Amino acid sequence: MTALDAPRGRPELSWRKPWWLVVLGLMLGFGLVQEQSKIKVNHYLQVGDAEQFWDQNAQERESWWQASAPVGRHNFYVSRATWTVFHSFSRGQLVAFKWGLSGLILLVFFILDVLLLRSTGVAERVPWLVVIYVTAGIPMLGLGFSSPGEAWYALARDMLGFLQSPLPSVMVVLVPWFLDRMASSRPGT
């Protein structure tokens, strides 16, 4: 059975050609890398704000960082390391970099989500994926207008975390299939 003649609502999760599994692996691997990247940016911003070293030049900041930077702890990530390029950014440039990085990460996850739909033979559901991204994106606009600790900020971060995971495409692939199975298992259908 190919993806084209698969029953409506049923994804093709072939073990002979497990492209869907490769895409899921890419999503999980990229998710780990992007999470570590965002933690590095946020840690550098927090340390920079606490130490007020934004007026120092790149060499002074790098020397200070190597000698005195605190260890960053976020859930199970523990690190002092940072990217050297951060030392040459002003605070405003680093915030712009953070937003650009978040946008790029969302774009990559959207592409991976579409690839998962295609690899499971349900590419016709891409519009549903777009609806999920737009719906989850509305609260994310709050990130630009709120600050950590506010309820809107927490909701927006949760929505961002949802989009930066395999969950949107996995939902679009599996939920219709589960609904069809439930409907067909009812007596009298």
Task: Label the predicted regions.
Residues 13-14, 117-126:
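Membrane-interface helix-boundary motifs at transmembrane edges
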Residues 72-107:
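Individual transmembrane alpha-helix segments
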Residues 166-179:
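Hydrophobic cores of alpha-helical transmembrane segments in multi-pass inner/ER membrane proteins
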Residues 151-164:
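Non-cytosolic membrane-interface motifs at loop->transmembrane helix junctions
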Residues 117, 142-153:
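Juxtamembrane "helix-exit" motif on the non-cytosolic side of transmembrane helices
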Residues 20, 122-133:
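Membrane-interfacial loop-to-transmembrane alpha-helix junctions, especially the N-terminal start
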Residues 13-55:
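N-terminal signal-anchor transmembrane alpha helix
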